[in-house]
């Protein structure tokens, strides 16, 4: 029997069912998937309960892909290069002023993000990577990690469970 499920439910279940846990907190994040870019869920036995949805306008995968593009790499393909480059830079907590951290799910102000991007100069093909590029990579990597930890903490505070499954395109980063 075949059953069709929501994009992020599929991501969540794919990590939960192979985890070996009989209960777990689950964070699924990527660029887009239907009407949302992620979910926060709880797996218990064979059941999955979605407790929060991350709307497309607040896509952490889109944020990462756009920075990938500005760094002169191919978005939706070269995000792993940005993750690797991040190790050579220093993140700047004050760089991304368009994020509201005072929520269960940190909120990306889409207009603020567009304005931020318009102030960047895209790295040209063949242009050498400089420290600014490395720092930007470190900042986007740190920001994604911080956001994922904040969402994971929200689930932990809800359930008390230390079990965590992370899935979706952002999980690699």
Where are these regions (language model features)?
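Short acidic/glycine-rich loops and adjacent helix/strand connectors
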Residues: 1-173
């Amino acid at each position: 029997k075949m059953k069709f499920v929501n994009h992020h439910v599929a991501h969540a279940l794919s990590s939960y069912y192979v985890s070996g846990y009989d209960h777990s907190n689950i964070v699924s994040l990527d660029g887009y998937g239907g009407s949302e870019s992620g979910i926060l869920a709880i797996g218990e036995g064979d059941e999955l309960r979605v407790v929060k949805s991350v709307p497309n306008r607040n896509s952490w995968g889109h944020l990462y892909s756009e920075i990938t593009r500005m760094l002169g790499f191919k978005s939706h393909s070269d995000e792993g290069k940005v993750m690797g480059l991040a190790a050579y830079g220093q993140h700047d907590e004050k760089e991304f002023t368009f994020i509201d951290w005072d929520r269960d799910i940190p909120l990306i102000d889409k207009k603020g993000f567009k304005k931020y991007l318009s102030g960047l100069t895209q790295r040209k093909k063949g242009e050498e990577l400089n420290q600014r590029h490395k720092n930007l990579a470190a900042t986007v990597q740190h920001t994604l990690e911080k956001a994922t930890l904040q969402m994971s903490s929200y689930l932990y505070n809800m359930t008390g469970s230390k079990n965590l499954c992370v899935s979706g395109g952002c999980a690699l980063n």
